[in-house]
Curated annotation (Swiss-Prot):
Gene3D superfamilies per the UniProt record, alphabetical: 3.30.70.330
Transit peptide start and end: 1-71
Name of protein: 33 kDa ribonucleoprotein, chloroplastic
Entry function: Could be involved in splicing and/or processing of chloroplast RNA's.
Length: 324
């Protein structure tokens, strides 16, 4: 049957039982996004995705997805009708999200509240070493050191989840500003929380941007730690002459840092001084990448060919011989 992803024919002897048998076998494809309406002179019944899910494991339905186009109606055949595709896709995504949330809901609310950001760690620090250190403050539920996906090297920060909020506060008291492996670590609650707390992030972002003082003398800063706040960026540049303001740029939908920001100064001289002083300086385990905001890369000029007096005289003689 042309134009269809699959086809099958129902003969006069085909019964509804045999067709149901076909659909109750373990599928090699997903029909989660479709509603199948089957009509024939010998049978008249309807199968939709909700009923099919009673026969198929949900995990197998989500593992693969084959979208079936509408097949032409033929006599003694089966017509496949695609109904409310957008609603089916939205429903499917919603159901999948609910399943994932149920599977991931293994930690209590108190444990979630005990999640800490730990910055400026030694690059050689391991999860087990960090867990041993924080065990001084209480029960350590989880340790996640963040690694670069390309180099597989530690990015110098981690997230430590303590057994309770009280233990997390004790860890902040004990370790924030302390020396770990020769480095002064920073320990606090993450600026961007999980779950429903993200709803208040848009207001926080607006507040951060409103406090920013703009200036034509502005630096663009990249390669920022994901957990670095606008206040942290201001603190890093506060001692620079002519410093005015700084802000980290956040994604408005997720509330997460985009890894870059801007710093403003009162004059071009102050801006250039900070550029020379702070470029490549490490902040929370990552070297800053500074550039003048809006500055385009300089266009490379063609190489200058130097000629000696001897070459000039040789060229003159050659031109004279050619013209004569």
């Amino acid at each position: 049957m042309s134009g269809c992803c699959f086809s099958f024919a129902a003969t006069a002897s085909t019964s509804s039982t045999s067709l149901l048998y076909l659909f109750t076998q373990k599928p090699k494809f997903s029909v989660d996004h479709l509603s199948l309406s089957t009509y024939n002179t010998h049978f008249n019944f309807k199968i939709n995705s909700t009923k099919l899910k009673a026969h198929f494991p949900i995990s197998s339905l989500y593992r693969s997805s084959i979208f079936l186009s509408t097949c032409a109606s033929v006599s003694d055949g089966v017509e496949v009708v695609q109904e409310d595709d957008e609603e089916e896709v939205a429903l499917s995504a919603e159901e999948e999200e609910e399943i994932e949330e149920k599977e991931e809901r293994v930690e209590s609310e108190s444990v979630e509240g005990g999640r800490l950001y730990v910055g400026n760690l030694p690059f050689s620090m391991t999860s087990s070493q960090l867990s041993e250190i924080f065990a001084e403050a209480g029960t350590v539920a989880n340790v996640e050191i963040v690694y670069d996906r390309v180099t597989d090297r530690s990015r110098g920060f981690a997230f430590v989840t303590m057994g309770s909020v009280e233990e997390a506060k004790e860890a902040i008291r004990l370790f924030d500003g302390s020396q770990v492996g020769g480095r002064t670590v920073k320990v606090n609650f993450p600026e961007v929380p999980r779950g429903g707390e993200r709803e208040v992030m848009s207001a926080k972002i607006r507040s951060t941007y409103q406090g920013f003082v703009d200036s034509p003398h502005k630096l663009y800063v990249a390669n920022l730690s994901w957990a670095l706040t606008s206040q942290g960026l201001r603190d890093a540049f506060a001692d620079q002459p002519g410093f005015m303001s700084a802000k980290v740029i956040y994604d408005r939908s997720s509330g997460r840092s985009r890894g870059f920001g801007f710093i403003t100064f009162s004059s071009a001289e102050a801006m250039n001084s900070a550029l020379d002083t702070m470029n490549e300086v490490e902040l929370e385990g990552r070297p800053l990448r500074l550039n003048v905001a809006g500055q385009k890369a300089p266009v490379s000029s063609p190489p200058v060919v130097e000629t000696s007096p001897e070459n000039d005289s040789d060229n003159s003689e050659l031109l004279s011989s050619l013209s004569s």
